[in-house]
Design a protein with these regions (language model features):
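Catalytic core of pol beta-like nucleotidyltransferases
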Residues: 1-26, 31-37, 44-95
């Protein structure tokens, strides 16, 4: 089941950002393989392209993925939070 959602996530990101302006990765319970209630999607990129992240939220809201996709702008995230995620969480890079 996880791989099916992963394929959908990759497809949605490719459609949303065909120029590959940002880097995308998954973290949190989805990646750890725990029973999850949401999917955490981290985004790193340039400021101009990050301004459209609310549009990306809409893309996932309208998708058939049965979990809420929380989009986290890692360029604007707290330093301690980024440290925790990058040092202690398993990451699954989308691109």
């Amino acid at each position: 089941m996880k791989s099916r959602y992963l394929k959908q996530i990759k497809r949605k990101i490719t459609e949303f950002d065909p120029s590959r302006a940002n880097k995308y990765f998954l973290f949190g319970s989805f990646v750890r393989g725990e029973k999850y209630h949401d999917i955490d999607l981290g985004v790193i990129g340039n400021e101009k392209s990050r301004k459209n992240l609310s549009e990306l939220e809409d893309v996932f809201y309208d998708s058939t993925i049965p979990y809420k996709v929380d989009i986290v702008d890692f360029d604007g995230a707290e330093k301690d939070f980024k440290h925790h995620v990058f040092k202690k969480e398993p990451l699954l890079w989308i691109r």
